[in-house]
Amino acid sequence: MRNYTYSLIKFFQKNWVYFLVFGLVFCYFASFRYLLIPSGDDYFWWGQPGDYLLHHGFVGPVKIYGASINGRYLGNFLEIFTMRHLKLALLIFAGSWTLMSWCMWKLENQTWWALILAVAFVFTLNDSLLNTVLVWNAGFINYVPPMALVLLYLVICKDGENKPLHKYYAILTLIIGLAAGLFLEVIAMAQIVMGLIIVFFFTKRKRGYHFSYLIGALVALVIMMSHPGYRMHIPYRETTFNPFKIWHIYVIANHIWLISLNTILIFLLLLAMTVIISRKRPYSFLDKLFIIVNNVFLIYYLIVGVYLKRVHNDNNYNYLLNPIFAQIDAIISLFLIIYTGYFICHYLSKQRKQVLFYYLCAGLYFGPLLFVASPVSSRSVFMSYVFMYLIMIDCVQTAFTGIKLQNFLFLIILLATLGIAGRYQMYLYENFNANLQRVLEPDYIQGKRLLNKHIPNRKFVWSKDRLDQQNVFYWRARLKK
């Protein structure tokens, strides 16, 4: 016992900085969640409809409950109880984002670059992902906790490649696979394929925890798909295998959310790729060609990023693009995806296998979305964005580690992260106070009219703070506490 305590003290002394960083990250997101303003579906699950579905196995009349009739048992359960219990909401929100940051850091070899970029992840989210995942409880619940669990499994797999793991890890991965598969249909299916890819192609040692994860994932898929809601005709849920319709949806929506809007990620990725090639000596003709192509992509996506800021988009971040531009941009996005894959295979030697796995996973979690005709939502690309971000971290570490400007570049990213983090908290605080003032207006709180004022920073409330998406009964109940 004494030796164990001594080892624990030594471990804390050696890693106290990391404990401090992730402790601050947890506190930041707890404060973040406290200041969030719920919207739309949050009130559906908080109120009588959510209570009815909870007590009827998430089954009910289609005309009333629509797509809420589903097998997302854990996601639905957490949405209901985080809306009813603020302390639980703070714990789940802060814990999930902190776990995701920690997993990214662990997967990227626990370097300082990995630490700052993992912490900065949420501040790189484009407006559509920010609005539908970060600042909306319903979006957060169904996307962030399961992805944090998927990344946790990958951390376990990586640790298992370097050292023997205790047999109890098999129980842990069984629980992870089961839990992660009860949030979203896409994750329930994709994590099984991901687990098989790891077993057959990306591990030297096949262990019990690999197979127990697969068992948990399979059980979760069976439980989810056994739900009667998937055998009902629900107009809101539609699939398509028509190649023209698939391409049309990719052109007008999916590629914009996946590629074009992610200016920060694309910029850092392409900049890192250019530096990686530039550090190679001597240059071949192919190297020079890649540098030119990199710079063309870089300039193009910076221009597109500025252009999209000026294009009108609705409350769901559907952009009203010029049809010709949308077609060209979609084609260029495919070239970028193919180009990135070739770059990984050709220029990344030490970490090629790991980055190639992320590349495949980004496609794996995006692929099923191509066949979804309705609902088409920006938050659906979140899982792929996570793996794209891991690719970027790998490339940035490879590019900037050891160069003369390393400390300067690190300082810039650190200051930018702290600045954006502070600004987000300021926006949320302004919104929180403005919302309190408007919901306390006598005519609203007495149910005589809807809200008639927007909060200052509308993108920090789901659907850009649509006034008809607030619920007077919720605010009456919350303000009484």
Where are these regions (language model features)?
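Transmembrane alpha-helix segments characteristic
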Residues: 116-124, 214-218, 285-309, 349-370
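Signature aromatic-anchored transmembrane alpha helix within multi-pass, membrane-resident enzymes
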Residues: 288-296, 345-363, 398-423
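Transmembrane catalytic cores of multi-pass membrane glycosyltransferases
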Residues: 32-84, 137, 185-193, 200-340, ...
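Membrane-interface transmembrane helices that cradle and orient dolichyl/undecaprenyl
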Residues: 150-169, 205
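Intrinsically disordered, polar/acidic, low-complexity terminal segments
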Residues: 3-67, 73-100, 108-113, 210, ...
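Membrane-interface micro-motifs in multi-pass membrane enzymes
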Residues: 120-158, 322-340, 365-392
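Transmembrane alpha-helical segments of multipass membrane enzymes and assembly factors
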Residues: 100-116, 125, 137, 398
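Alpha-helical transmembrane segments
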Residues: 14-29, 114-121, 171-175, 212-221, ...
